[in-house]
Amino acid sequence: MLPQTVKVGAGRTSVDVVLSEDMIGLEDVVVTGYTTMKRKDITGSVSSISADRIERIPAYNITTALTGIAGIRMDGGSIRIRGTRSRNASNDPLIVLDGIPYDETLASINPGDIESIDVLKDASSTAIYGARGANGVILITTKQARQGKTTVTYDGFVGAGVNNWGSLDVMDADEYIAFQREASRAAGTWHSEADDAKAFFGIELANMGKVDNDWMGKYFNKKRLWTSHSLTISAATDKSAYKIAFNYKNEDSRYKNAGHDHFYLTADLSHKVLPFLKVGLSSRAYYIVKNDKPDMFNQFLHMSPLTQTRNEDGSYNVYPFGDPFVKNPYMNESDDVYKDKTEEWKLFLRFFAQIDLAKGLTFNTNFAYSPAFSSRGYYYDNRSVSYTDERNVAFMHNNRKADWVWNNVLSYKRQFDRHNIDLTAVYEMQNRQTVNASMSGKDQESPAYLWYNMGRLTDSKSLSSGFVRSQMVSVVGRVQYSYDDRYIVTASFREDGASQLSPGHKWAFFPSGAIAWRISEEPFLKDVEWISNLKLRASYGMTGNYSIAAYATAGTLHGKYANFNGGELHRPGLEPETRPTPDLEWERNKMLDIGLDFGFLKGRIHGTIDYYDSKSYDLLYLKVLPYTSGFNRAWTNIGDTRNRGWEVSLSTVPVETKDFHLGVNLSYYRNKEELIRLQDPKMKEDINNGLFVGYPVNGVHYNYKQVGIWQENEADLAAIYGQKPGEVKVADLDGNGKIDGNDRTILGTTRPDWVGGLQINAEWKNIDFSVDVYGEFGSLAHDGRSTSEWANQLGRWNTYKIDY
């Protein structure tokens, strides 16, 4: 805020001050690794999202707000920052909530509680988080109460949509009849309508001319609603502050008796006990109940338009074809046929204390405890599309977690004339513990029991349980020095010890360094009014990855029944599954980043340009072993990967008047991801494990190249390959006159050549309008349904209309 000077005259008993926004406000303060700093002092690559941006996207999951940020890509619901590095170890970024590593999903955080999100992308920014920062860091800062009167805020929205499968078109009754007859004619079983009994089920014959049932259209084109309601109460004085918030979200499903309900409760309290001591509690409770139904899209695609959904009495027709192997997909809507319910309870408690030891010297201690419990149960009987057994089945699984993190941060910030120094030292401990138990069985006495009375199951009972614990200890140091707001140097280190790895390999050291030059503060540019910011920066650092199962290096066994003495009785035993790997090393990542931050016309045009080059060494990989080894798989360090690319972000304010504001944000992101070395440097590919040097570690489409359809005038040539006209023509790449495994090739990858985003925000008085566009270009997608369920198959198994 800009400073204000107000004169106080004689007899004036109150003063009202309205602070005006300055270029350096909350949005210019960035959270970076256990501390905060002004954006102008940052030496690494950091992208930020404000609460305004989040509020303009009324979404259930704050992941939506991250789309469009340069360097971030959504991959199947997962967040990827600057590419994928590892094949089997985790590629997920670290989430830090109010300074504490947060192991739950972003969906468990109420978007309305968020003040800002800062995304750390380069190694100098993430190295301070060591092994957990290898895939980038997402720092979330929640809203706090502001000084003033008690405020009560309500926020809500309602969204509507349609479950539409796009342009998918299915056959009506007449088209289906013609298709069945033509298909049977081609198979030699149909010559005239007298042969219809060979092409159709009896029920279909009886319904010809009477029934034309659009199974899919009636089911999937249903309207859906999304609702969200938030209520917040907050107040603060110069000593105390509190904020209590409640949020409820509901999302309808495409299926009846299905949907998700989310409940959030937040309570933040802080109090300045002494002039030098501040304590507080931050708590977040999250409860979700999910009633799910199975994906029945394939089953609907198999339904004939000549069959009925319901019987004459209004009940569902269980077997529309009169065939026990083809059931009515609508049956799964009934809870006494199929019910799948999950409940999750999560609690996040953070106790903190801040002690001002001396001028510029502050000690912060944070202890976070996050217990969680989840319970899932499902039940379905033989009327369900998902089940073919004559008996019903019940299953239940309970999972209990108890994680805690304790970090102690000592920081020193001082300014001496033109010199600024910022020192940070951290000691951190983490503990994760999980206990789970599962039970399943068949032949429940009554559907009313569902999974709540597992003792009454009479067949195929199965019990299992597990316990997992992992720990980590870290020591962190960081120093930043700047001279005259022009030259900035940052260095950090982190030493991590992880229990997942074997003795002798548990510890790893991660250093980093960065420099920045604020060119706009040089005398030759400082007086150029249209340049508000120009900063050149470079960084280099190392991070690591140890994200494997807690006991992976020890090897595992699994149960198996076997015949030991040649008799008929099989007895339980154990056999090796994964081979012990006591020499497993840390996966390490080194990254170089060179960037330019710029701002013109007092910040109305600003942005960043970054080039980065990241190399990962000794990839953690769960390798498939040959049967002769006696093991199925083994963890190993297999090779190296590389991610390099460009990021460009541009924000502008083309129009700014008293009543109208127009903002435009553009982003561009290009990343080349490749495997550069296998465990054996002479190897260029490991087809058995899907690894190819020069290509991404996953997402590679390695298959036969289809070049068309064999035509009637190519019958002789097709016969050479054992094919005939009408079948798919596959390229004979090695030219040996036959199609075999040697004709497979790399068709492409799921990685896009580039990603772009556009955001437009217009505000007129109290009305705002926003548009968000996000696109990926150059990737190759494989649609499994197009090559299976939608493929050209005979008869009732496909009603998808194909234009040949």
Across the structure, where does each feature detected by a protein language model lie?
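Extracellular/periplasmic, surface-exposed regions of secreted and cell-surface proteins
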Residues: 54, 91-92, 262, 268-277, ...
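Extracytoplasmic gating/loop element in the C-terminal half of outer-membrane beta-barrel translocons
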Residues: 206, 498, 776-804
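Short, small/polar-rich motifs associated with maturation and membrane association
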Residues: 1-266, 273, 278-280, 348, ...
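Conserved small-residue
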Residues: 153-208, 438, 636, 646, ...
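Short aromatic-centered micro-motifs
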Residues: 95, 310, 481, 733, ...
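Acidic, glycine-rich flexible loop segments
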Residues: 189-211, 226-230, 297-332, 339
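Structural motif
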Residues: 97-98, 312, 416, 483, ...
